[in-house]
Amino acid sequence: TLLAQVSHVASKFSVYLNYAGYFGAKNSMPTASSLNQIGLTASATLSDKFSIGYDGTVQLLKNEILEESTKWWGSALYLNLTASDNFGLTLRGEYFGDEKYGIKVSDANGDGVNVFAATISGNYKVGNFTLIPEFRLDNASSNLLYTKKDGGATKSTSTFLVAAVFSF
């Protein structure tokens, strides 16, 4: 197993390049001759009110015994607004691809799918209490990934949640 990271941190910008992998693990469960994953995380402060972030990764898994390989990847872009000391908003766009069934996100037919998601989160602070409402829309490349209330298949879904955090 090999883990590695190269980074650069400046006052208004940071970037991290990460690697995790192993080779020669033919008797592991699940069986894999090699697994390689590389990721990039970066953030930049554009002003006192705005910042941007990126997080992306790709993973390749090779199985010599079964003579197959899998691959998946994902990317997320974050746009942050700090409106005041007590309130902020984050818009996150994510896309992940599982065309070679690497993370086992498949539709009802067993085919790998790609998903785009957009999330908007608020962050409201009062003393030690933080309220975080979030709304998310997901859209998949297959209409067989999500299930409607009536049991029918659909390619999109939405979620609303509220988190409450108290810090000691």
Predicted regions and their residues:
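Outer-membrane beta-barrel pore domains
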Residues: 8, 13-23, 29-168
